Amino acid sequence: MFRIQLRTMSSKTCKSDYPKEFVSFLNSSHSPYHTVHNIKKHLVSNGFKELSERDSWAGHVAQKGKYFVTRNGSSIIAFAVGGKWEPGNPIAITGAHTDSPALRIKPISKRVSEKYLQVGVETYGGAIWHSWFDKDLGVAGRVFVKDAKTGKSIARLVDLNRPLLKIPTLAIHLDRDVNQKFEFNRETQLLPIGGLQEDKTEAKTEKEINNGEFTSIKTIVQRHHAELLGLIAKELAIDTIEDIEDFELILYDHNASTLGGFNDEFVFSGRLDNLTSCFTSMHGLTLAADTEIDRESGIRLMACFDHEEIGSSSAQGADSNFLPNILERLSILKGDGSDQTKPLFHSAILETSAKSFFLSSDVAHAVHPNYANKYESQHKPLLGGGPVIKINANQRYMTNSPGLVLVKRLAEAAKVPLQLFVVANDSPCGSTIGPILASKTGIRTLDLGNPVLSMHSIRETGGSADLEFQIKLFKEFFERYTSIESEIVV
């Protein structure tokens, strides 16, 4: 008799609610601005209060308090202050980044070719650009709108969550070698179509822009298709497209993020690099924010930066003064919420830096079953196998033995499996925000991250079980770091 043995749920499948919540997070975080907005909502729902860099924090930040601050709407730092915090005490820090490789709409995007309305785009980061062809593309980001009553420019988030644009490939009949080598010009052939030109389109546009007023640069209607502007205006419920002053918009795969695989062991989505770490560090902090906070002598802090994919050198990137400035403010904060005096402050920030630890979290390369020879033979991370500790002798990653011992202890206490990764000697190695912040602050640092396949594709693959593993690890790190940091000193 022929029998079929049904498999039980795979051990690599996560039984928690985190995978479904992560998918929802991904589907509402199509730009760094939306990502930070969603992190803010989660923090506020867990009792965190917003601060501003423009204000003094004296009297506003106190022991047992929970706070967050944003910069540019695309980077965010959140922290919980221990009940026994004093200047000079340690800070447990996790770091991630909010950006991903993408196509960004150019300042003057209006293009027309062969009666097609096209949108000029600029490549951002090092994506696998061929993966963007033949995808239904949505548009999301930040729009500045003029308030008719006050005259102020107001930033609004917009997500045109519909199949709006497409970059079509050339038919195989016209390119017989396409399956041997797919080549294209990123300036002229990585250009999406958005509609068909009508004879009245140009006349309508000229009428709208010919109002006789002086403008320092081309008007918004001269720079972008009125059809695109009209969709933005409708989404934001504003009266006229002329109220749109400028925008920062990126394209994304409209195909929704989802769980997949025989047992939902996979997450199929864009932007896993690095919204994975944003999501897990966010949950790790909020889960630990109130745990024995009365007895906590340190601060528990998470940072999510913009612009990692292009080197981090911006006002809101990891190479900026954003984190150092926050550490500076916290290092002059006395237990009663007032500020320290200058001489004490200088010593305190040095002591805090020496005692603190930074977990730089960015996704890692999972072993690819079809290209296993591309990996170092003894370091092949598996999806569902837990967070990956990344090591590089040339300091592309910051992991060293003291840090590894520390994280190993935390993982064992939290029952979290870990994996190790180094690149093969004949392969290039990427990097993270870890080396940038380690050299900038002198804070001890370790690089780790959850494994993914197809990194920098428009559609990546992660492991659903790894989400809970990393959240548990971060929670353990926040809760226990100050009690064990003195045990591993070099």
From Swiss-Prot:
Family: Belongs to the peptidase M18 family.
GO MF terms held by the record: aminopeptidase activity; metalloaminopeptidase activity; zinc ion binding
Biological processes, Gene Ontology terms: proteolysis
Protein name: Aspartyl aminopeptidase 4
Functional summary from the UniProt entry: Aspartyl aminopeptidase that contributes to peptide degradation both in the cytosol and the vacuole. Cells may respond to environmental conditions by changing the distributions of the cytosolic enzyme to the vacuole when cells need more active vacuolar degradation.
Cofactor comment text: Binds 2 Zn(2+) ions per subunit.
Organism in which the protein naturally occurs: Saccharomyces cerevisiae (strain ATCC 204508 / S288c)
Alphabetized UniProt keyword annotations: Aminopeptidase, Cytoplasm, Hydrolase, Metal-binding, Metalloprotease, Protease, Vacuole, Zinc
CDD domains found in the cross-reference section: M18_DAP
One Gene Ontology term, aspect cellular component: fungal-type vacuole lumen
Location relative to the cell: Cytoplasm; Vacuole lumen
Reaction(s) catalysed by this chain's protein: Release of an N-terminal aspartate or glutamate from a peptide, with a preference for aspartate
